[in-house]
């Protein structure tokens, strides 16, 4: 969510990534949905709204919006804000992120093409920047996926897994999840026994810019993204493919 400080507050969702995980085949498919996607959510009474606005009505509402869009049941969620994002990455000792662009975010860091080792604040700046790119929000979405992939790779490494309880203690209160601690422990134990790396694929749906009123702004037109439904259908196929492996 697009706030610092207390993670429990209701706020707009800044990044919306659906992770489809098959623990048997060690395959993860990430689906990124732009925050300005113009879709319905459970609280919008059939009126379209920005996906980011869904979070104003609770995390369950954001989950419902993505479930409706992709026709899939979401079993668990992880919710964090900017502060928690920075804290988690710092607790892991930083992450290694590949950049396909050379750019600078003042006054944080200059990012070079190739692998960049990033602290929490540097990873956040990398994930949020869009003005440096001709593709704008599309490139930002791709960079956000790269950060998530780097986080998954670091979290599934032996160095972190062997110390996962210390890592969790260090980031307590920086994120919210409905996954029980026993379920987290089971996943950690399984990964320690079979340290095969996960294959991680990513896909971002896009759309066309438009100006429309929304459920949350009924009297004011705002910039939205009309979904490319062919890409949404392709994303559905990717999701079902991983689940059926």
Over which residues does each language-model region extend?
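Non-catalytic, solvent-exposed segments at the cell envelope interface
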Residues: 1-245
